[in-house]
Amino acid sequence: MWESHSQHRDYFTYGRGYWDAVAAAQQAKGVGQPAGSAIYFAVDFDARGADLVPVDQYFRGITAGLAAASGGKADYKVGVYGSGAVCDTLKRSRLAEYTWLSNSTAWAGSSSFADWNIRQGRPFASLGFINHDSNEARDDYGGFRLAGL
């Protein structure tokens, strides 16, 4: 998942989406992430109504940035992490192929959105000091395994 300053509406512009996608693609290639797998981009706030306009522009920038990073055709598929409203809007507009539904059930559309590929569960602690979230994935979520691991 690519997450920068995705907790604020003002972060989401076409230009930031473009450059985040270029950086994410470079990082993915650097670690050996195979073409055809997904990079998820986070929208980590309760975006609703007018908030979805800059989010849309950000994901249009992502589409262009991933294509540019690969010489014209994107090597990676686009996923989104966010509320049900964000996931639904971006999937319907075909700006995201995969959705990772946030566990923030009070966020817009989250309790009713059913077309998720990954659904975040409740956070819990492991070893008493490392906090992490559980996640449930459906068949195809754009994942991959690195060769030899």
Locations of the language-model features?
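Short linear motifs at secondary-structure transitions and domain/linker junctions
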Residues: 15-19, 53, 75-78, 91-96
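Substrate-binding cleft of extracellular glycoside hydrolase catalytic domains
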Residues: 1-48, 58
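Active-site-proximal loop/turn and secondary-structure-junction residues that shape catalytic pockets
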Residues: 5-6, 45-47, 82-86, 124
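Aromatic-lined carbohydrate-recognition surfaces of secreted/lumenal glycan-active proteins
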Residues: 67-88
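Sec-exported extracytoplasmic/periplasmic mature domains
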Residues: 26-33, 63-71
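Functionally critical loop-and-helix segments that line ligand-binding/catalytic clefts
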Residues: 87-149
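Active-site cleft segment of glycoside hydrolase catalytic domains centered on the general acid/base Glu
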Residues: 45-70
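Structural recognition of the beta-strand scaffold that forms the well-ordered cores
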Residues: 1-2, 37-42, 77-80, 99-101, ...
